[in-house]
């Protein structure tokens, strides 16, 4: 690992590589902890290292989804368009708590504030709906990748945004049709989109979007989608 060149990575991103993430098995049972760096190295992923994560899809009251473009100084998938916020609960008592996925929802509140500058009082853990879980794996490049048991969370609220440039290059709100257009542009090689945004859009959002007033029928708390 010592010979990996990270000169291009933002200093704050380097510091976050030492955060302790929650290591799980394929059924989301906690089996330990490891650094963010180790969890995202392909050499460890190929040996089966798997960690807990989350993806947030945030809609405003006009039913437009917040899409962010990842900073060019992110370690994985730099410059890619992605979901509203994706990150990890940390290996600490508050974010390990599993009842009603409260630990993950606390982590999501923390990262929505850190990445997008959304004040904590604007989105509480109670505003964050735990929808389902998916298990995914993706390579960013020959060194770095993702292998996650990912909690899919939904928020529908108007918020104030002040993105951290070390995390987020740009933000935009898209209608359902505009999101499909973005995915079509990615298929033509015109833009870069994270694999998990495509997964979320194609596997889940097409069903949820017409029913944002009440997504309760689509909640799947005990299912892990293998994608």
Swiss-Prot record:
Matches recorded under SUPFAM superfamilies: Nudix
Functional pH dependence: Optimum pH is 8.0.
Binding site for substrate: 36, 70, 74, 87
Main localisation: other
GO biological process: one example: dimethylallyl diphosphate biosynthetic process
Active site (UniProt): 86, 148
Uppermost EC category: isomerase
Location within or outside the cell: Peroxisome
Pfam short name (any one): NUDIX
Any one Gene Ontology molecular-function term assigned to this protein's record: metal ion binding
Cofactor binding note of this UniProt entry: Binds 1 Mg(2+) ion per subunit.
Catalyzed reactions per annotation: isopentenyl diphosphate = dimethylallyl diphosphate
Motif (Microbody targeting signal): 225-227
EC number: 5.3.3.2
InterPro entries: IsopentenylPP_isomerase_typ1, NUDIX_hydrolase-like_dom_sf, NUDIX_hydrolase_dom
Binding site for Mg(2+): 40, 51, 146, 148
Assigned keywords, A-Z: Cholesterol biosynthesis, Cholesterol metabolism, Isomerase, Isoprene biosynthesis, Lipid biosynthesis, Lipid metabolism, Magnesium, Metal-binding, Peroxisome, Steroid biosynthesis, Steroid metabolism, Sterol biosynthesis, Sterol metabolism
Disulfide bonds: none
Domain (Nudix hydrolase): residue spans on this chain: 49-199
Stored PROSITE patterns: NUDIX (PS51462)
GO CC annotations on file: cytoplasm; cytosol; intracellular membrane-bounded organelle; peroxisome
Tissue-specificity statement: Muscle-specific expression.
Entry function: Catalyzes the 1,3-allylic rearrangement of the homoallylic substrate isopentenyl (IPP) to its highly electrophilic allylic isomer, dimethylallyl diphosphate (DMAPP).
UniProt family annotation: Belongs to the IPP isomerase type 1 family.
UniProt name for this protein: Isopentenyl-diphosphate delta-isomerase 2
Organism taxonomic ancestry: Eukaryota, Metazoa, Chordata, Craniata, Vertebrata
């Amino acid at each position: 690992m010592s010979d990996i060149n990270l000169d291009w990575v933002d200093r704050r991103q380097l510091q976050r590589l030492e955060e302790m993430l929650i290591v799980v098995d394929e059924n989301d049972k906690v089996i330990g902890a490891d650094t963010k760096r180790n969890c995202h190295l392909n050499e460890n992923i190929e040996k089966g290292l798997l960690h807990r994560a989350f993806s947030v899809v945030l809609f405003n009251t006009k039913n437009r989804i917040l899409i962010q473009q990842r900073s060019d100084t992110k370690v994985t998938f730099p410059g890619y368009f992605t979901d509203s916020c994706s990150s990890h609960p940390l290996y600490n008592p508050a974010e390990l708590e599993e009842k009603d996925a409260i630990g993950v929802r606390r982590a999501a509140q923390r990262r929505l504030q850190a990445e997008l500058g959304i004040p904590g009082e604007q989105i509480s853990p109670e505003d964050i709906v735990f929808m389902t879980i998916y298990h995914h794996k993706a390579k960013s490049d020959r060194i770095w990748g993702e292998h996650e048991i990912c909690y899919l969370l939904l928020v529908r609220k108007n918020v104030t945004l002040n993105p951290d440039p070390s995390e987020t290059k740009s933000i935009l709100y898209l209608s359902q049709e505009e999101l499909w257009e973005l995915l079509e542009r990615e298929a033509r090689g015109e833009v870069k989109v994270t694999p998990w945004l495509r997964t979320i859009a194609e596997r889940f959002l097409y069903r949820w979007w017409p029913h944002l007033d009440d997504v309760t029928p689509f909640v799947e708390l005990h299912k892990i989608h293998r994608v």
